[in-house]
Amino acid sequence: EMFSGCTALPSLDLSRLGTSQVTRMWGMFSGCSSLTSLDLSRLDASQVTNMGKMFSGCSSLSSLDLSGLHTSQVTDMGSMFSGCSSLSSLGLSGLDTSQVTDMNGMFIDCLALTALDLSGLDTSRVENMWGMFEGCSTLASLNLSGIDTSRVQDMGHMFSGCSSLASLDLSRLDTSRVAYMNGMFKGCSTLSSLDLSRLDTSQVTYMNDMFEGCSSLTSLDLSGFDTSRVRNMRGMFEGCSSLVSVTIGEKGGSIL
C-alpha cells in the first residue's frame, strides 16, 4: 500500500525504487486516481508473491505495459486491475501467471476495456475466478481459448455485468470442480444465445441469479445440467424477458 490513496499524484518515477527484496505489492498504487501513466520497466518484482489490488482504482490510467514486470512468483492477483475504469488497452501476453491461484475480481469494473485476450495466460493453478470480468460493460470481445480452469472452484459473477458481450465461447471452460456459478452471467443483456453443452455442473451448489437480466436470451438448453448438488436457484432466470424455451435434462429435475 506504498502509494495507496495518493489521489492527486499525476506521475510517478519508479526507476530508483529498490524493491529487489519486496515480497508483497498488495494495493501498491491503489486509489491513485490521477495517475495517467506508469512506467513499470524498472520495477523489480522478482520476489513478489502478492499483487492483489496493485492498480485498483487507478481510474485515469488508459494503458498499462506489463511486459517488463516479473511475476513468476506471484500467487495472488485478486482485484489487480479493479476499478481501472479508463483502461482501454492491456497487453497480458508477457504476464507470467504460472503460480497464480487467485484471480477473483481481477478486471472488475474495467469499464473502458472493449477486448481482452487471455489465450497467453497460464491459469493452470487458479482456484478462484469470482467476478473476474464483472462490470466490464463495454467488453465486446473475450478470448478464452487457451484458458485452463481445471482447478477453479468459484466462478460466481464471473461475467456479471458484461452487457456488451454478444457471444461467449465456453467450450474450453473446464468446470468439473466448480461449486459456485451464482450470478455467473447476470446482466449479460446482449447475449442472444449461449452454448452450455460443455459446462460440467456436477459439483455446483449455487446457481442463484445465474442468468438474471439476460434479457436477449430466447432459449436455453440445460439438458446437460446436473443439479443434484445445487442448494440455491433463487432468481436463476429472473429478468430473462425474451426467454421462450428452457430445456431440462434427466439430471436437472431440481430446476423444475
Regions found by a protein language model. Give the residues of each.
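Negatively charged
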Residues: E1-L256
